């Protein structure tokens, strides 16, 4: 597992965007052979999205032959609701780039049969040959997507009941009223993410420091979803300095030494 440590959020956002763009350009996607990209919502990837939008505008990267799959969606929230993840993605990314609408795939939290919706989502991913790069963020407890602590490390896309901590944390998007926050969501599973050819997780802020320590210095533990990345053959964590405060000095020095030639990844 790789750990890229940059100074601040702006720096890790730029690095992450450059990495996504580099992978797409290396693949040279076509209509018949698109690049398959997994994407997250939340505050962590917003900076990356802004950088990718700018790169798209100046012609550094195109999303014309990119197919996307998002990580999760609330259950029972209309897709046009301002806090739905569908709205988030179109407002913060898709509407600003040259991606084809038919190439955007998102879970439907209002499907009549939620179990079938999850199964069909998994099958759709498989029909494209799997996800080439899955980008994600984490919560303070190390969860990825809505794979809360205790999630099976082999879990697939499914319906999940949200923990009270997650509901309280997300209430800031719902007028700080926990009664307005959906109580469940559809989410890709840990196994779904781990099946991707490459996984890149963005970690920023001192409140993620404990989770990063569990990801890097502790063993694999289903109570810390991010620790599963230790088992992936091609995983990258991109972290700002604030999130490294609970790592040992030697750990930080080690990763800085081996990654120093990769800090500038401009394309």
Swiss-Prot record:
<dbReference type="GO" id="GO:0006046">
    <property type="term" value="P:N-acetylglucosamine catabolic process"/>
</dbReference>
<dbReference type="InterPro" id="IPR006148">
    <property type="entry name" value="Glc/Gal-6P_isomerase"/>
</dbReference>
<feature type="site" description="Part of the allosteric site">
    <location>
        <position position="151"/>
    </location>
</feature>
<feature type="active site" description="For ring-opening step">
    <location>
        <position position="148"/>
    </location>
</feature>
<dbReference type="GO" id="GO:0004342">
    <property type="term" value="F:glucosamine-6-phosphate deaminase activity"/>
</dbReference>
<comment type="function">
    <text>Catalyzes the reversible isomerization-deamination of glucosamine 6-phosphate (GlcN6P) to form fructose 6-phosphate (Fru6P) and ammonium ion.</text>
</comment>
<feature type="site" description="Part of the allosteric site">
    <location>
        <position position="158"/>
    </location>
</feature>
<dbReference type="InterPro" id="IPR037171">
    <property type="entry name" value="NagB/RpiA_transferase-like"/>
</dbReference>
<dbReference type="GO" id="GO:0005737">
    <property type="term" value="C:cytoplasm"/>
</dbReference>
<keyword id="KW-0378">Hydrolase</keyword>
<comment type="similarity">
    <text>Belongs to the glucosamine/galactosamine-6-phosphate isomerase family. NagB subfamily.</text>
</comment>
<dbReference type="InterPro" id="IPR004547">
    <property type="entry name" value="Glucosamine6P_isomerase"/>
</dbReference>
<protein>
    <recommendedName>
        <fullName>Glucosamine-6-phosphate deaminase</fullName>
        <ecNumber>3.5.99.6</ecNumber>
    </recommendedName>
</protein>
<dbReference type="GO" id="GO:0042802">
    <property type="term" value="F:identical protein binding"/>
</dbReference>
<feature type="site" description="Part of the allosteric site">
    <location>
        <position position="254"/>
    </location>
</feature>
<dbReference type="GO" id="GO:0006043">
    <property type="term" value="P:glucosamine catabolic process"/>
</dbReference>
<feature type="site" description="Part of the allosteric site">
    <location>
        <position position="161"/>
    </location>
</feature>
<dbReference type="Pfam" id="PF01182">
    <property type="entry name" value="Glucosamine_iso"/>
</dbReference>
<comment type="pathway">
    <text>Amino-sugar metabolism; N-acetylneuraminate degradation; D-fructose 6-phosphate from N-acetylneuraminate: step 5/5.</text>
</comment>
<dbReference type="GO" id="GO:0005975">
    <property type="term" value="P:carbohydrate metabolic process"/>
</dbReference>
<dbReference type="InterPro" id="IPR018321">
    <property type="entry name" value="Glucosamine6P_isomerase_CS"/>
</dbReference>
<feature type="active site" description="For ring-opening step">
    <location>
        <position position="141"/>
    </location>
</feature>
<feature type="active site" description="Proton acceptor; for enolization step">
    <location>
        <position position="72"/>
    </location>
</feature>
<feature type="active site" description="Proton acceptor; for ring-opening step">
    <location>
        <position position="143"/>
    </location>
</feature>
<keyword id="KW-0119">Carbohydrate metabolism</keyword>
<feature type="site" description="Part of the allosteric site">
    <location>
        <position position="160"/>
    </location>
</feature>
<dbReference type="GO" id="GO:0019262">
    <property type="term" value="P:N-acetylneuraminate catabolic process"/>
</dbReference>
<keyword id="KW-0021">Allosteric enzyme</keyword>
């Amino acid at each position: 597992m790789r750990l890229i440590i940059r100074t601040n959020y702006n720096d890790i956002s730029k690095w992450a965007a450059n990495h996504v763009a580099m992978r797409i350009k290396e693949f040279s996607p076509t209509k018949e052979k698109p690049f398959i990209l997994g994407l997250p919502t939340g505050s962590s990837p917003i900076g990356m999205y802004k950088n990718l939008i700018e790169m798209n505008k100046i012609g550094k990267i195109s999303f014309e032959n990119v197919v996307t799959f998002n990580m999760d969606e609330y259950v029972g929230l209309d897709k046009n609701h301002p806090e739905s993840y569908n709205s988030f993605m179109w407002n913060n990314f898709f509407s600003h780039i040259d991606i084809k609408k038919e190439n955007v795939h998102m879970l439907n939290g209002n499907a009549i049969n939620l179990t079938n919706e999850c199964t069909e989502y998994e099958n759709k991913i498989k029909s494209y040959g799997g996800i080439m790069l899955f980008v994600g963020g984490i919560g303070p407890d190390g969860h990825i997507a809505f794979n809360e602590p205790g999630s099976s490390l082999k879990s697939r896309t499914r319906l999940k009941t949200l923990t009270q901590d997650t509901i309280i944390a997300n209430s800031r998007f719902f007028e700080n009223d926990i009664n307005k926050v959906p109580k469940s969501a559809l989410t890709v599973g840990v196994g779904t993410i781990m099946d991707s050819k490459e996984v890149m997780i963005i970690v920023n802020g001192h409140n993620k420091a404990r989770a990063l320590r569990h990801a890097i210095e502790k063993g694999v533990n289903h109570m810390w979803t991010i620790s599963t990345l230790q088992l992936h053959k091609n995983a990258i964590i991109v972290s700002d300095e604030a999130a490294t405060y609970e790592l040992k000095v030697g750990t930080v020095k080690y990763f800085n030494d081996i990654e120093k030639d990769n800090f500038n990844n401009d394309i």
